[in-house]
């Protein structure tokens, strides 16, 4: 059964990277060496004989709203950014920085916002599970260069911003299957923070 959600424009095609590893014993490593690597196709190919139905919908994705940042979450973000800056100065993180893997929610938004505001931290890439609201703004500001994830968990206004400026975002966001976004081999290879 295929769902065709007409609320999502066809112009979003190209943001996806569908990769299916080979079966053992010939399976190789997942060939992601930087977050922006595209290793698969932008769609799933299915034998037409296997399709039993197409369900048409026209429903935008619904994402619960996060509370606004408060003094505590802002301070957590500032502390994490200051810690990572100190680690760079001490040489434990390269001067070019490393990709970020963030969680989702207010604290993750606070940390990402603080990283974006800290001018001692260079523009960075993300290899994460969830791409959320703060990432959209940081991309527009040039602070996040690229984000790889398995979902866009953004509010309606941010999703509309992505859709309205798809030519800008299509080359800066890739959506992958969860087994690729959360793969420990890839996370270790990239040196995710």
Where do the model's predicted regions map?
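Conserved phosphate- and dinucleotide-binding cores of soluble alpha/beta proteins
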Residues: 1-99, 106-193
